[in-house]
A protein has these predicted regions:
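Hydrophobic/aromatic-lined pockets within catalytic cores
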Residues: 22, 26, 100-104, 241, ...
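P-loop NTPase motor core
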Residues: 2-46, 50
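Charged, low-complexity, helix/coiled-coil-prone segments
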Residues: 29-39, 178-183, 206-209, 232-243
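Alpha-helix initiation/capping motif
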Residues: 9, 18, 31-34, 83, ...
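Intrinsically disordered or highly flexible coil/loop and linker segments, enriched in small
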Residues: 27-30, 34, 54, 101-108, ...
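Conserved helicase NTPase catalytic core signature
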Residues: 44, 48-220, 233-234
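Conserved helicase motor core of SF1/SF2 NTP-dependent helicases
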Residues: 2-11, 207-220, 227-276
Length: 276
């Protein structure tokens, strides 16, 4: 997942296995690895079509060029039938138009006059051309790479909303314990880190926010040691490769999700070969 999340370092498997999980930590890992949690993340993302998407200001020279409130206004100003993918693409187009207009205005400001006062006419023309290009390239990349979305803030907001979507008591988790876990997650994110238990839901949420539909060209997927995967991870793989026929190998008696859930989930995955 590291290439998918360049700004976040995910806990490795070896780090995970050296941790001795107490019963409380195990409960948190169990809920985050469940099929119910996968559905809860999906439901949360669906809600983002109407409200609560988190945005970041588009900056230039330390100043706000396009405020996040304006981005929110654009994003939620489209037809209510738009899905997250439509909203993302249409907002990008609108931001590019605004950016082009604002840069032309910016290049006529006093700081530009001061910078070019001792230059020749040709040098001034070159300064304007290169200056606009340089600004546009940086901000266009900010827009095209979806950096105006705030995945960390969004992920934390999702965790805070989770008790409204999912009955955590079913997993033996109190609201107080969940609040403590959110605090720990925020602490990790501030250090640029993410627990292995959070990695799948973080990537899945980002994929939903950015309208990814999965790789439809992959037709066959072989997964060994399937008992080491959580139900969430398998459901996420199904989302990521929607047309793939799954062949799962491993010992289902040792699966980290329940036997009943595993059979149901494997059935949904359309697995043609399950060895247990």
């Amino acid at each position: 997942s590291s290439h998918r999340l360049p700004s976040v370092q995910v806990e490795t498997l070896s780090e995970r296995f050296t941790e001795q999980l107490d019963k409380t930590a195990q409960k948190l890992t169990d809920v985050k690895g469940s099929l119910d949690y996968f559905r809860a993340v999906s439901a949360y993302a669906n809600h983002l079509n109407k409200e609560d998407m988190r945005f970041r200001n588009l900056m230039f020279n330390g100043d706000i060029l396009i405020p996040k409130e304006k981005i929110a206004e654009i994003y939620y100003g489209f037809n209510e039938n738009y899905n997250l993918r439509n909203r993302l693409e249409s907002t990008k187009e609108e931001l590019m138009k605004i950016l082009n207009r604002k840069i032309h205005v910016e290049m006529r400001k006093k700081w530009v006059e001061d910078a070019v006062q001792n230059l020749s006419k040709e040098e001034i023309q070159q300064f304007h051309a290169e200056g606009e290009e340089e600004i546009l390239n940086a901000d266009k990349e900010f827009i095209s790479r979806n950096h105006w979305l705030s995945i960390n803030n969004q992920f934390v907001h999702m965790l805070k909303e989770m008790p409204k979507i999912l009955n955590l008591a079913d997993f033996g988790i109190s609201n107080e314990l969940w609040a403590e876990e959110i605090k720990a997650t925020v602490g990790r994110l501030k250090k640029g880190r993410l627990s292995l238990a959070d990695a799948s839901s973080y990537i899945y949420l980002y994929d939903l926010m950015t309208g990814k539909r999965g790789d439809k060209d992959i037709r066959y997927l072989f997964i060994d040691e399937v008992q080491d995967y959580s139900a969430f991870q398998l459901a996420f793989l199904k989302f990521s490769f929607p047309r793939a026929q799954f062949t799962l190998l491993g010992d289902l008696n040792q699966a980290i999700f329940t036997h009943e859930n595993s059979r149901k989930l494997l059935g949904e995955l359309g697995s043609d070969s399950i060895q247990s």
